[in-house]
Amino acid sequence: MPELYEQYSAKVELGSKVKETKKKINDAMSIMQLDELKCRKRVLRRFGFINEAEVVQLKARVACEISSGDELMLSELLFNGFFNNLTPEQIAAVLSVFVFEEKSKETNALSREDLAKPLKEIQSQARIVAKVAQESKLAVNEDEYVKSFHWELMEVIYEWANGKSFFDIW
């Protein structure tokens, strides 16, 4: 009987150590998430989505209404006047960059100059966003972030927006 009691006491003690360790892990995770939250707020502040008092600004309200794509990038492009001089067909093609997620094995360069220029601007803005995120101590790989905007459907969407059928495009 004393042996069983000792084993039971050891089990209870180990159980309490497990609970303590889990609590320490949860506390550490909370601190890590809090640090990440602070970094993300820093990014939002730098781009003017929130002010110093962390009050949501117009840019952030617009970003909240964007339901697909990279909200930060699209809001920045919108407020920087990126879409102002584009035709509706170009806008449709450009927006495909933000929703197309497939990786293409064959990547040829864009043949249309009127699409290549906006794509370069998107990639340039993506580099700026990635650099600000890195400066704000977020773990963002600049090249991976830029490559996450897949342009492979741009020409197809452009032709479709100009009235061609998918049968004619493919």
Predicted regions and their residues:
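Non-catalytic terminal extensions of ATP-dependent helicases
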Residues: 1-170
